[in-house]
Amino acid sequence: MSVATGSSETAGGASGGGARVFFQSPRGGAGGSPGSSSGSGSSREDSAPVATAAAAGQVQQQQQRRHQQGKVTVKYDRKELRKRLVLEEWIVEQLGQLYGCEEEEMPEVEIDIDDLLDADSDEERASKLQEALVDCYKPTEEFIKELLSRIRGMRKLSPPQKKSV
């Protein structure tokens, strides 16, 4: 068995190492000894192009996988996801203060950000929030005003609906 090394900057950068090692059987017969090939060291030279072709194929597969994984971040931008997460954490914190309890003890309150973003006006959004917070005994006006301010400029994360023609 001969050893061929091949390196590529993309392969090395992806795995964190420099050169990659590939094991390739010699071409000159099934279990031959090193002396059975026509020239000394020729099996290593013959297998090197095969190993680099295999390395190129693996690099191409890794790039395709990265491209497929990248589709998720194209559909849902990481920056938008982070903004959404920060907003949701802020909402949970504010609801805890409004209801005067921990998250586990909080009554079931559903605030759908995408639903709010679908609303045509701030008045409609405020109305939906007031309906969701009807059981809250503390004043909710400040929370509603701040939430409406925070969602301004955000985009919906739900997949777009197909329009019927």
Curated annotation (Swiss-Prot):
Q: Sorted alphabetically, which keywords does the UniProt record give?
A: Acetylation, Cytoplasm, Membrane, Methylation, Phosphoprotein, Protein phosphatase inhibitor
Q: Where in the cell is it found?
A: Cytoplasm; Membrane
Query: According to its UniProt record, what is one Pfam family this protein matches?
Result: PP1_inhibitor
Query: Residues annotated as region Disordered?
Result: 1-73
- What is the recorded post-translational modification? Has over 600-fold higher inhibitory activity when phosphorylated, creating a molecular switch for regulating the phosphorylation status of PPP1CA substrates and smooth muscle contraction. The main inhibitory site appears to be Thr-73.
What GO molecular function terms would the record report? protein serine/threonine phosphatase inhibitor activity
Expressed, tissue-wise, as follows: Detected in breast cancer.
Provide the positions where the record notes the PTM Omega-N-methylarginine: R27
Is Cytoplasm a UniProt keyword of this protein?
yes
Kindly list the positions at which Phosphothreonine occurs in this protein.
T73
Q: Where is the composition biased (Low complexity)?
A: 1-12, 35-63
Which Gene3D superfamilies does this UniProt record tie to the protein? CPI-17
Please name the InterPro entries in this protein's record.
CPI-17, CPI-17_sf
Residue numbers bearing the N-acetylserine modification: S2
Topology versus the membrane: Peripheral membrane protein
* Chain positions found as Phosphoserine: S25, S33
**Protein's job:** Inhibitor of the PP1 regulatory subunit PPP1CA.
Q: Which family does it belong to?
A: Belongs to the PP1 inhibitor family.
* Protein name per Swiss-Prot or TrEMBL: Protein phosphatase 1 regulatory subunit 14C
